[in-house]
Swiss-Prot record:
Residues annotated as signal peptide: none
Keyword Transferase: no
Ranges of compositional bias, category Polar residues: 1-10, 64-76
Protein name (Swiss-Prot/TrEMBL): cAMP-dependent protein kinase inhibitor gamma
Region spans: Disordered: 1-25, 48-76
Disulfide bonds, paired cysteine numbers: none
Annotated family: Belongs to the PKI family.
Keywords assigned by UniProt, alphabetized: Protein kinase inhibitor
GO molecular function (one): cAMP-dependent protein kinase inhibitor activity
Coiled coil regions in record: none
Keyword RNA-binding recorded: no
Function (record text): Extremely potent competitive inhibitor of cAMP-dependent protein kinase activity, this protein interacts with the catalytic subunit of the enzyme after the cAMP-induced dissociation of its regulatory chains.
Length: 76
């Protein structure tokens, strides 16, 4: 119970108020992460997503370009 009371008193004593600002300040590991590293990680995510979509799109086009015979199989 003491833990809640100390965080409550810390919040009350700071200049933040209102519902929007009801979250305490987060300053722990935020300084350890650089913007450059985050941008690099985001770039890798974007590239992996684009490559995956391109492969799916290509296989869909190949499947749709092969005509089906009357028995339901594709001709090669």
């Amino acid at each position: 119970m003491m833990e809640v009371e100390s965080s409550y008193s810390d919040f009350i004593s700071c200049d933040r108020s209102g519902r929007r600002n009801a979250v305490p300040d987060i300053q722990g590991d935020s300084e350890a992460v650089s913007v450059r590293k985050l941008a690099g990680d985001m770039g890798e995510l974007a590239l992996e997503g684009a490559e995956g979509q391109a492969e799916v799109g290509t296989s869909d086009k190949e499947a749709s370009s092969q005509p089906e015979s009357s028995d339901g199989t594709t001709s090669s």
